[in-house]
């Protein structure tokens, strides 16, 4: 056992070093051929992919499974907190239907955040927050068409990601409250805004090596409690879960009647594809809802933005929730309006804005890009033409999915309890991860596809926007998911109700070819090569079962 344990440590150290290496480019599908050098490089990386997967898979077999991993036969949808949504698909507004919405926003920062004991959720390097630059919040909108089918909760938490386990803990608290007050809710959804410089909401930045080392012994002894040193991280999780439940309660109490409007907004002026594959004119548009209360009180905007929240650097050592905070702030200052921002198919999409920091203090300079980007996004929302009033028709469904990881790094992360996703074992002892996806439609005109992972734009909108870029030379066989329901335009929400890494098109999954070749480490945080096609197929099946 000691020899095997040493191999585990050695491999993880070597793998961490690999993440800092060099550059090779994917090729486009329409190219007639590939150079000999590219063929050699691809062959090398493909071989390396097999070696790495073989090594990590072997480590997973050596590493004891946590005692609370269950057999798939013991899986219970209600017990784990899955919600199926509404029973029927409404094709029009019934008499008496009307929109109502309530909003709430709370800080999720603990009072002792300045004491240097909480982790920033950026990477495995155990970065500690030394203070606060702006805030870290949960924002919630509760929406209903008052058809008697149940309301929908849309929540967004400033964070890199949220595990399904924690989302379902929030659900349990909300459902208990709703039962207590007699409030019917059909769907409870929480997204991570994907801010890279806030406290760790997922667990990925909390003492990786300590969990790796002590987790082996804990698992072998059947112990399920956290390893020593996790007290602050565990407290923060419980705190943001409690604050999220409280925010939903406040939003329910805030509900009032009004009108709901929709518009599509072009944010491409301030967004770019870091890979250079998606041209400005092909950057997907943003969906935006605007709720206007009958009482004349503050409006609420809900937007999905296809842009990474990486304008404020985690290297500052301060909690900063990036452009989301300043977009929210600008809307409030200008109109008093509320905001729920959920992430679109963010993939490698990032900011494209230049800020003149001449004359700024070091403190001002830190947040200059985030402030400017948030303000520009807010201006575009305020300038939008919200003249398209939506009929009070709300449709929502969810589908349970069971994912077999092709990337054993994800299994290892669960084995060492780096993340707390629930894992079940099939009859052959293979790990399965339960998760979910959803479909949320407004007015029979526009909808959100709710996805448990971080989609690349081309995986959702089809790879024409990347000129058919492929790693393995095959084609991506799916059309845009945005047109899956006739008469409805659909937009993606990523990292919602779970955080299962990146979702590329199957044919452009290169793993080490991108990690080493292009210094893009996304695929180390992916379920595997076929995650894209798996989710797309499950999505179409969900739609076919619901929209009849």
Predicted regions: what they are:
Residues 381:
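Glycan-recognition surfaces in beta-rich domains, encompassing non-catalytic CBMs
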Residues 33-191, 195-372, 385-548:
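Conserved beta-alpha junction segments in alpha/beta enzyme cores
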Residues 377:
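Anionic-ligand-binding alpha/beta catalytic cores of soluble enzymes and soluble regulatory domains
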Residues 1-12:
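Bacterial N-terminal signal peptides that target proteins for export
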Residues 19-32:
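Sec-dependent signal peptide cleavage junction
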């Amino acid at each position: 056992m000691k020899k095997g344990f040493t191999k585990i440590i050695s491999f993880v150290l070597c793998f961490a070093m690999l993440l800092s290496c060099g550059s090779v480019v994917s090729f486009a599908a329409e190219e007639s051929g590939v150079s000999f050098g590219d063929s050699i490089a691809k062959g090398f990386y493909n071989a390396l992919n097999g070696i790495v997967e073989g090594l990590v898979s072997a480590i997973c077999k050596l590493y004891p499974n946590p005692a609370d991993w269950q057999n798939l036969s013991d899986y219970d949808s209600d017990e784990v907190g899955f919600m199926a949504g509404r029973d029927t698909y409404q094709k029009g507004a019934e008499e008496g239907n009307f929109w109502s919405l309530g909003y709430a926003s709370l800080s999720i920062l603990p009072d002792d955040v300045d004491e240097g004991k909480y982790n920033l959720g950026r990477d495995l390097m155990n970065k500690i927050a030394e203070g606060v630059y702006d805030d870290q919040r949960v924002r919630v909108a509760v929406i209903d068409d008052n058809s008697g089918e149940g309301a929908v909760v849309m929540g967004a938490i400033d964070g890199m990601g949220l595990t399904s386990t924690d989302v379902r803990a929030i659900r349990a608290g909300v459902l208990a409250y709703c039962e207590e007050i007699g409030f019917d809710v059909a769907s409870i959804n929480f997204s991570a805004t994907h801010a890279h410089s806030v406290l760790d909401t997922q667990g990925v930045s909390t003492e990786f090596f300590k969990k790796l080392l002590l987790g082996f012994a804990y698992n072998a002894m059947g112990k399920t409690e956290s390893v020593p040193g996790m007290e602050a991280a565990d407290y923060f999780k419980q705190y943001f879960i409690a604050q999220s439940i409280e925010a939903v309660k406040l939003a329910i109490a805030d509900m009032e009647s009004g009108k709901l409007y929709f518009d599509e907004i072009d944010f491409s002026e301030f967004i770019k594809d870091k890979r250079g594959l998606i041209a400005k004119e092909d950057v997907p548009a943003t969906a935006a809802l605007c709720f206007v209360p009958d009482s004349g009180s503050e409006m609420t905007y809900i937007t999905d933005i296809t842009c990474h929240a990486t304008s404020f650097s985690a290297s500052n050592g301060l909690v900063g929730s990036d452009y989301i905070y300043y977009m929210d702030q600008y809307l409030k200052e200008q109109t008093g309006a509320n905001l729920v921002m959920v992430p679109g198919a963010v993939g490698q999409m990032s900011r494209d804005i230049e800020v003149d920091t001449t004359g700024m203090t070091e403190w001002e300079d830190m947040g200059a890009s985030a402030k400017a980007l948030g303000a520009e996004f807010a201006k575009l929302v305020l300038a939008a033409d919200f003249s398209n009033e939506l009929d009070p028709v709300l449709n929502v469904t969810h589908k349970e999915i069971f994912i077999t990881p092709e990337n054993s790094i994800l299994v290892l992360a669960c084995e060492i309890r780096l993340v707390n996703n629930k894992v079940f074992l099939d009859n052959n002892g293979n790990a399965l991860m339960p998760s979910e996806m959803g479909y949320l439609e407004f007015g029979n005109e526009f909808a959100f596809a709710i996805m448990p992972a971080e989609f690349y734009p081309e995986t959702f909108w089809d790879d024409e926007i990347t000129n058919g870029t492929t790693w393995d030379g095959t084609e991506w066989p799916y059309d845009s998911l945005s047109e899956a329901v006739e008469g409805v335009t659909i937009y993606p929400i990523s990292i919602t109700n779970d955080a299962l890494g990146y979702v590329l098109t199957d044919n452009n999954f290169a793993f080490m070819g991108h990690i080493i070749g292009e210094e893009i480490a996304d695929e180390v945080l992916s379920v595997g090569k076929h995650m894209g096609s798996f989710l797309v197929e499950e999505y179409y099946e969900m739609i076919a079962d619901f929209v009849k």
